[in-house]
Structure formats: C-alpha cells, structure tokens
Amino acid sequence: MIDPKQLRSLVKRTLKRIPHGHSDSSEIAVLMLSAHESRLGKYLKQTQGPALGMGQIEPITHDDTWKHGYSCAANAKLLRIDRDVERLEYDLVYQIFMIRQRLFMKSELLPPANDLWAIAEYLKKHWNTVHGKATAD
C-alpha cells in the first residue's frame, strides 16, 4: 500500500498540471477510487482480469478514454505523456492522469468535496456502473 499522505501529495500535484483537473472534489475522487479499486496501490494488476493500476482501468477503457476523451490528447501533450496502456501498472502519474481524464468524460459534475457520500455515489454510478459489485459504502 502506498503511504496515503504521499499519494495525496502526488495526486494534488498531478491534477494541478491538468487544465481544470484539480479541485478538492477531484482530489478526493482519485483517492477514493484508488482506495477502493486497488487498496491504495496494493493491487496494480487485477488478480483475475485485465484491469491495471490504482484505478483498475481495463485496457478497453483506457483506449476508449484516449479515443473519445475530448481533452485527453491535448492534456497529455501538455504533460508530456505518451499513450501506453502498460504504464497503468507502474506509472503513478499516468494512472492519476487517466483516472481524471475518464472522469472528465462524464457530463455530471463531481459533487462538492464536503459531501463524501455524494462523491462515493457518483463514483459508483460513473466508475463502476450501477450493475457492478461495488457499493458507495
């Protein structure tokens, strides 16, 4: 598991480099996803599946984000990030970048940072889908 304070610092610094990427809500959302999906980086590869990284992003989702994310290529260029699905397993900045880019694709805005339950429900709806095993709890 990655030290939560160090991870939060890296998340904040990375999100601030992405145009419109940082807010207290987005910082919390990335950390919540990382805690839930990979236990803060304990699992960087799904034990029985294709998902990779702290956000457990599947290669098909990665590729869809690059193809359909309106700001993905432009933001990657600004951050000098090259597209490479394998980086999801070992590059924390790339993982944070991809989580944020995926969240940018949702038309519904992130809830306020002071409403953790609403952020958890938002992530359940937009990250795991209502049909997945995860709950907002």
Features from the language model and the residues they span:
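A broad structural signal for alpha-helix termini and local helix breaks/kinks
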Residues: I18-P19, W127
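GGW-centered surface loops in extracellular recognition modules
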Residues: D24-S25
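Acidic helix/loop microenvironments that form the catalytic cleft of cell-wall polysaccharide enzymes
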Residues: S34-S38, R102, L110-T135
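Short beta-strand->loop
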Residues: G55, A136-D137
